[in-house]
Amino acid sequence: MLAPTPLPIQVGPATVTMNHNDRFVVCQPDGRIVDTAAEGFFARDTRFVAGWELLVNGRRPVLLNSSPIQYFSSRFEFTNGKLTDDAGPLEPQSLSIRLDRTVWGGVHEDYTLANFGRRAVRLTIEIEINSDFADLFEVKSGEIVRRGAINSRWFRSRRELRTTYVNAAFRRELILQVDRADSPPQFANGKLVFIAKIEPKRAWRTCLRWLPITEGGRRPQTLPCHSIAAAPPEMSEVRLPLVRLEASNPTVVRAWDQAVRDLESLRLEDTTAARGVIIPAAGVPWFVTLFGRDSLVVSIQTMSGHPEFAVGALRRLARLQATEDDPERDMEPGKIPHEVRHGELAKLGILPFTPYYGTHDATSLFVIVLSHLFHWLGDVDVLRRYLPNVEAAMAWIDRWGDRDDDGLQEYKTRSSHGYYNQAWKDAGDAIQHADGTLAPLPLAVCELQGYAYDAKVRLADIYDRLDRPRDARRLRSQAARLFDQVNEQLWWEEEGTYYLGLDGSKKPIKSVASNAGHLLFSGIVPPERAGRVVARLMADDLWSGWGIRTLSSEHPGYNPFSYHTGTVWPHDNAIVAAGFHRYGFHAEAARIARATFDAAERFQANRLPELFAGLVREESTFPVQYLGANVPQAWAAGCVIQLVSMLAGIDARSDADGSRIYVDPALPDWLPELSIANLRAGRGQVSLRISNGNVETTSNTTGFEVVRGPAPALG
């Protein structure tokens, strides 16, 4: 008897998400918004709508189906169950009730109720919308404190309900406007009420707009009626051409296409001024704002053909780079910010997030991204433009990054509201000793050393391009000393990997974690040790089958559902895979890539979430969702681009002799051929076809030479 063929599996969060710019809606599959859940309509870190419900003759309609249509729109289809009007019972399933919802500036809703019964019906349609104006941080924690006053007023002539929130200098307002309706609206008992008389085979319609009023007091524009499937309006004057992928593996193509859509959907409008200036929000729902680390990681992930993310990140973060010392914001001169917030807690100074600087790695990553961008643009002017910023960043690395002047990078918050951990694993319990106890501050986490090393190597290369050989030699000397120190003090011989770091007493943190893979990515691992590190990271206690866990399953602090102590993060795995590839471990890198694409295939829309559970993979099953994961999320999307570029072996180098795109493919048997069109570099675009180890350039307007082979090492 033949074994049954497994059914296609697609899992995902039990909510519907729509987003555009810094506005988003998270709701139930039936469109409801539950005020006790982490749901609502949010704009600039404030929840403007905390509850929504539709009633027809006092009953909830019966959900038939719902689905996102575009990243900013969804449709909800209902019918009626048992329902009675003044003429008696209605036939079950005789009503079609449709809700279309779009997010763009505000929210636009189209309601259509069609009568397919044999008689006319009289319906009381009630739409309940309530607001709490809660700060996003408190919605996330579930500990909401109302500090200001809420007032609502119905303006009958304007057909709008205005709800205002005021707390000292912080003011927000929601305008609920009836845009058009086939019967006049009323406002009673906290609900919009319509009386609809619908003849057989006729329909009743209304449109509502939710208008959030933030700083400046202007009413935002929403999309017009019936726009759920429309091509999205442009946020910038010139639309960038899509970088297209064709491949023999359809799963990879679907994951790529969704990743590109996610990155497009996460663009922040206030930083998107023109062609080539794009910064993605970090993720929906919790990180719909500018994050230093996230925007820079996405820049690195997508550099092979998507340099506009790096252009936007450097431009915006350079403007926010610290120039003074403010302990409450963990701010020191030269430091790159962690995040910028606009909600009540930030605006009134309750949280120091305007912006907050409590991240260590973003400052090194800023230098690294500039180096990558130069090599992909071939424009020395970009180095001159940002040289003061990267020199200030390096000064921070040397003074503030190394707080005790021992040669290693460490962090310790100085803020009363600061983050305990300030590397990418920034959950409070992320860095534990072997017995599960928290490692005391300050912490010299291992990957920070790799980032600082890479930043020094790359700044030396920048100095070479600017004809400053003395400074280049100085940075290379510093990098060499850090290389030796890391490999002397952080190497863990018994485990064949690196310590997670050193704690505040310089005691090694003997916990096996994914962090060591970032050292391979940074190039700070001696070649003779690389094989042992790769083998340790691929051992069963770290390898789940869907990817490498953040922490060994043998560690007492391991929990497959914990944010940073046992889950699998796609972006973490892509960085580790790129490190494997850098040292020539192509099979192991491809294994991580295959597992990541297998996971994407099993998530809704082939969309990778921020993270998922570290449970062991079993045959014909699926990766388990992490409760509260951001979906879409920028560096989860970016990892798809990074993995494809890694397998294709694409990189760029620019020097005094010219600029070149190097292509050194190591395609696995599950991806024997691919074509990438419209990779952006230099002055134009390049399209490549890779098959059976052969590389064909099908078009090239970049001004770069395409070279078959690996890119030379820097320095």
Enumerate the predicted regions with their spans.
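Terminal accessory carbohydrate-recognition/targeting modules of carbohydrate-active enzymes
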Residues: M1-S265, T272-S295, I300-V311, R315, ...
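Extended glycan-interaction surfaces of carbohydrate-active proteins
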Residues: E77-K82, E246-L290, R315-Y357, D402-A444, ...
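Hydrophobic or amphipathic alpha-helical targeting/insertion segments
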Residues: D110-F116, A120-R122, V369-V382, E391-W396
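Alpha-helical support elements that line or immediately flank enzyme active sites
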Residues: D294-D325, N515-P527, N573-A589, A593-T596
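TPR repeat positional signature
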Residues: T363, V367-L370, Q449, K456, ...
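Inter-helical turn/loop segments and adjacent helix faces that build the functional surface
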Residues: L370-R385, K456-R474, F580-A587
